[in-house]
Amino acid sequence: MEWRGLVQNISSPELIDKLNKGGMTFYIGTDPTADSMHIGHYSSFLISKRLAKAGHHPILLVGGATGLIGDPKPSSERPLISKEEVEKNIKGLTAQAKKIFGFDVVNNWDWTKDINICDFLRDYGKYFNINYMLAKDHVKSRMDVGITYA
């Protein structure tokens, strides 16, 4: 795929060796913005299915917590979705992902729901590199047009 120009960057060149060995567990993430899969899911789900056939183990991470915060689009803000709507969407996505792709599914709400903001900032904030985040194109574009973080 790299020689075809389909790879923009590789976060870790060692990853290629790991992919060739098989047996790696990885996740793909999606926010529950709808109760059904759509074409936007297709490419990452298809690649995950192919990796599963090559001996890897995909896990679908559904963003029950991140879906409540917002969707990081570079040029517009998404209206907030109610907790009830997010829960309904998670049920639909989970059922489809298990049936069609056989994925294990986890929800980030399960391990974030009990963390308060002070604990989060104290325990995890130190791992966020502001320069790294500000260098990202999607963050820059949101700042340029004055869109909030969510």
Short names for language-model regions:
Residues 2-150:
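NTP-dependent nucleotidyl-transfer catalytic core
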